[in-house]
A protein has these predicted regions:
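Hydrophobic anchor at the beta1->P-loop junction of P-loop NTPases
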Residues: 46-48
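A glycine-rich beta-strand to alpha-helix segment
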Residues: 365-395
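Hydrophobic positions on the alpha1 helix immediately C-terminal to the Walker A/P-loop
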Residues: 56-60
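Nucleotide phosphate-binding/pyrophosphate-handling subdomain across enzymes
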Residues: 131, 136-141, 149-159, 163-167, ...
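Conserved catalytic-core segment of NTP-binding enzymes
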Residues: 145-147, 154-211, 318
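ATP-dependent carboxylate-amine ligase catalytic core
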Residues: 9, 20-21, 26, 30-41, ...
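Charged, amphipathic alpha-helical linker segments immediately N-terminal to NTP-binding catalytic cores
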Residues: 1-20
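C-terminal helical cap/extension that packs against the catalytic core
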Residues: 193, 197-215, 279-280, 288, ...
Length: 397
């Protein structure tokens, strides 16, 4: 391999190195991890799995620790605009240089072991955080839990936010099967915090099988937060319990905890922008459960609403639409330039006959039309790609 210099060169090379984009299993990445960290990672670890709410829960934890003057690293996925978003230290995303240096360190030790794009990302996150000498790291599971690459690290505490039907090709098509996969992040004699209000029995069974400690959180946080939606109070409660579990190592003052929760913010989770006197809501809700939550938040303010929507073909799109259509007066459908996207023609067939739908040639024309419509509110949702496309254009307004 010739010397790779830029981040784009590294990422293009990784995509071709291991052509199977998703290749679940820990054997390959474990080999390289042990070479990089023979004694384990030098920081506290919180691992977060769950169908929805992971990013918001991480935002709460991140903000609490920053407010308390601890150095915190967060590894999240997918990114919205820039790959570097996946690695943050005290809220600042990693530079191209630091990511390339991490990739270089991995490549030096990798040998003949083939790694996927996501496995490279996971190892790079750990290398970056170790180099930055962070106190605590929050790792977001990319898919499932049991066989996801972040599961090479033994967490000091883990969180399962909730269980809903998603990624059925990989995780199974029942909540019990998906719960089993998420429960794979648990460890014996280590606490796992679960926020699901009706948890599948597979989570408790797995905890019993391995001797993990399991705590169910049912009561939402009652304090002030900036993030909108009742579900965010539940996410905040999970974050509080996680930082409380690490109090001996990373002591948090109650006042700093409250301030951290209130300051927490995250892109594209009912993110509200005002453009040309129109309210625009950006939300990465991309499955039935998340869209139901989005609908509940929209219902808090009953105003004429236009949706800009697109989705991936492996989702249950009929249920996604039916979960929110009572809140939407008009739909603008946009194409996505990713392989997994459903075509606009196939997408239209998922709607009821009474829906008012317009196909737009791209996101720019959809936003132009939305900003000149009679509807007071515009909501952009359906996938990370949909929202990312909108954000790139709205940044120019």
């Amino acid at each position: 391999m010739g010397r790779l210099k830029t981040l784009d060169e590294w990422l293009n090379w990784q995509e071709n190195l291991h052509t199977q984009e998703i290749d679940l299993g820990l054997e390959r990445i474990q080999e390289v991890y042990k070479k990089l960290f023979p004694g384990g990672v030098p920081f506290q670890v919180i691992t977060i799995a769950g169908t929805n709410g992971k990013g918001s829960t991480i935002a709460f934890i991140d903000s609490i620790y920053q407010q308390s003057d601890f150095k915190v690293g967060a590894f999240t996925s997918p990114h919205l605009i820039k790959y570097n978003e996946r690695f943050s230290v005290n809220g600042e995303m990693a530079s191209d240089e630091s990511i390339c240096q991490a990739f270089d360190a991995i490549e030096t030790l990798r040998g003949e072991t083939s790694l996927t794009y996501f496995e490279f990302s996971t190892l790079a996150a750990l290398v970056i955080f170790a180099h930055e000498k962070v106190d605590v790291v929050v790792l977001e599971v990319g898919l499932g839990g049991r066989l996801d690459s972040v599961n090479i690290v033994n967490p000091n505490v883990s969180i399962i936010t909730n269980i809903a039907i998603d990624h059925t090709d990989y995780l199974g098509d029942t909540r019990e099967a998906i719960g089993f996969e998420k429960a794979g992040i648990m460890r014996s004699d280590t606490l796992c915090i679960c926020g699901d209000q009706n948890p599948p029995t597979s989570i408790q069974k797995q905890a019993d099988n391995i001797g993990a400690l399991l705590l169910f959180i049912n009561e939402p946080y009652q304090g002030n937060i900036t993030l909108k939606g009742e579900h965010q109070q539940h996410n905040a409660a999970l974050a509080i319990e996680a930082v409380n579990q690490l109090q001996l190592t990373l002591p948090i003052d109650k006042n700093q905890l409250s301030i951290g929760l209130e300051k927490a913010n995250i892109l594209a989770r009912f993110q509200v922008k005002t453009v040309n006197n129109k309210t625009i809501v950006l939300d990465v809700a991309h499955n039935e459960a998340a869209i139901k939550v989005l609908a509940e938040t929209l219902k808090a303010e009953k105003v004429p609403t236009l949706a800009i929507f697109s989705a991936l073909k492996d989702k249950n799109i009929e249920l996604m639409i039916s979960s929110i259509e009572s809140c939407i007066d008009e739909w603008l459908i946009v194409p996505l330039s990713v392989n997994r996207a459903i075509s606009t023609q196939d997408l239209i067939e998922k709607f009821s006959l009474s829906s008012k739908i317009t196909i737009c040639k791209d996101m720019a024309s959809a936003l132009h039309q939305a900003l000149n419509t009679q509807q007071q509110r515009v909501v952009v949702f359906g996938s990370f790609h949909t929202v990312a496309d909108a954000m790139k254009i709205l940044d120019k307004y």
